[in-house]
């Protein structure tokens, strides 16, 4: 029997009198086949360490611990710590850290692995309400995570992996794909969770690029320009740029100059621009004094 078997999950929750906290976005997976697929998708073996976020009662952790060198699981809900100590008692390669991943000093924390030089993969069932902040925090942390295999709301997975000229494409697609490749591995129905969420989930596999997808003069400015391009999706790029940078004649003249330098039509919409287009635009705008 596995922790994720429905009868086992229910028995654990009943034994500890555990009640779900909506503020933590808690939905526990009760399908062992899906858990096996997650670990297979992540290609976990004894040559990698794993960071897990939100282990819950340890359903995914159990599968990870069987395959990985070590697992470090970050759990924000202190009520789950004694439950995890119980459900994972047979594993000596799991550390549970009772901390918000967004506040953790990851550089220091990762030194707690027995062999901190092993590649690190992130495997997690992320809370829907905080998926994007967690992902961007980890991606921008400068820690060389090799890969992310994470469950999230289907809509967010679609946005992250989207291509230009699609409804889902936006600044989040650009922010992630600049650093990583992103592909939906499979979809997870809402019916396999306790309690069942209101939407379906997807497993997104993201692999870090050796180098960012493009080279830009100023990364922060590049991300800023890409966000500006999507502020009002139905507006033209020109209207979004003017709304953001200002309507002064000198400003508009420099915007025109930057667009011309980048070879981009002012009448285009942000969703039609590739990451490379946004990179050229950001560099051109820097060149004309922004």
Curated annotation (Swiss-Prot):
InterPro entries the UniProt entry points to: KsgA/Erm (IPR001737), rRNA_Ade_diMease-like_C (IPR023165), rRNA_Ade_Mease_Trfase_CS (IPR020596), rRNA_Ade_methylase_Trfase_N (IPR020598), rRNA_adenine_dimethylase (IPR011530), SAM-dependent_MTases_sf (IPR029063)
Where do the coiled-coil regions begin and end? none
Instruction: Indicate whether rRNA processing appears among the record's keywords.
Output: yes
| Binding-site residues, S-adenosyl-L-methionine | 27, 29, 54, 75, 100, 125
Return the SUPFAM superfamilies for the record.
S-adenosyl-L-methionine-dependent methyltransferases (SSF53335)
- Protein localization: Cytoplasm
* GO (cellular component) term, any one: cytosol
Q: Electron transport as a keyword? A: no
Q: Which PROSITE patterns match?
A: RRNA_A_DIMETH, SAM_RNA_A_N6_MT
Q: Which reaction does it catalyse?
A: adenosine(1518)/adenosine(1519) in 16S rRNA + 4 S-adenosyl-L-methionine = N(6)-dimethyladenosine(1518)/N(6)-dimethyladenosine(1519) in 16S rRNA + 4 S-adenosyl-L-homocysteine + 4 H(+)
EC number(s) for this protein? 2.1.1.182
Question: Which keywords does this Swiss-Prot/TrEMBL entry list?
Answer: Cytoplasm, Methyltransferase, RNA-binding, rRNA processing, S-adenosyl-L-methionine, Transferase
Q: Which GO terms describe its molecular function?
A: 16S rRNA (adenine(1518)-N(6)/adenine(1519)-N(6))-dimethyltransferase activity; RNA binding
Do you know which Pfam families this protein is assigned to?
A: RrnaAD
The entry assigns this protein to a family as follows: Belongs to the class I-like SAM-binding methyltransferase superfamily. rRNA adenine N(6)-methyltransferase family. RsmA subfamily.
Query: What the protein does?
Result: Specifically dimethylates two adjacent adenosines (A1518 and A1519) in the loop of a conserved hairpin near the 3'-end of 16S rRNA in the 30S particle. May play a critical role in biogenesis of 30S subunits.
Q: What is this protein called?
A: Ribosomal RNA small subunit methyltransferase A
The organism named in the record is Streptococcus equi subsp. equi (strain 4047)
* Taxonomic lineage of the native organism: Bacteria, Bacillati, Bacillota, Bacilli, Lactobacillales
């Amino acid at each position: 029997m596995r922790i994720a078997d429905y009868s086992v999950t229910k028995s654990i929750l009943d034994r500890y009198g555990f009640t779900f906290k909506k503020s933590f976005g808690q939905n526990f997976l009760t399908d062992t086949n899906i858990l096996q697929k997650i670990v297979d998708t992540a290609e976990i073996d004894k040559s990698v360490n794993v960071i897990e976020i939100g282990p819950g009662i340890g359903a995914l952790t159990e599968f990870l611990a069987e395959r990985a060198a070590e697992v470090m699981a970050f759990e924000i809900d202190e009520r789950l710590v004694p439950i995890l100590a119980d459900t994972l008692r047979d594993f000596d390669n799991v550390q549970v850290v009772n901390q918000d991943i967004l506040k953790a000093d990851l550089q220091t924390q990762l030194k707690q692995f027995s062999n901190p030089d092993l590649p690190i993969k992130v495997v997690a069932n992320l809370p829907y309400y905080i998926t994007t902040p967690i992902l961007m925090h980890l991606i921008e942390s400068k820690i060389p995570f090799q890969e992310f295999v994470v469950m999230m709301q289907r809509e967010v997975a679609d946005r992250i992996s989207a291509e230009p000229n699609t409804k889902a494409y936006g600044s989040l697609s650009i922010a992630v794909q600049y650093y990583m490749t992103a592909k939906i591995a499979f979809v997870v129905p809402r019916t396999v969770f306790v309690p069942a969420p209101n939407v379906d989930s997807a497993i997104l596999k993201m692999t870090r690029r050796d180098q960012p997808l493009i080279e830009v003069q100023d990364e922060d400015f590049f991300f800023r320009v890409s966000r500006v391009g999507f502020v009002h999706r139905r507006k033209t790029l020109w209207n979004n740029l003017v709304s953001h940078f200002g309507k002064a004649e000198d400003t508009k003249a420099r915007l025109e100059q930057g667009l011309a330098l980048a070879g981009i039509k002012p009448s285009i919409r942000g969703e039609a621009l590739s990451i490379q287009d946004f990179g050229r635009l950001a560099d051109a705008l820097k060149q004309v004094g922004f």
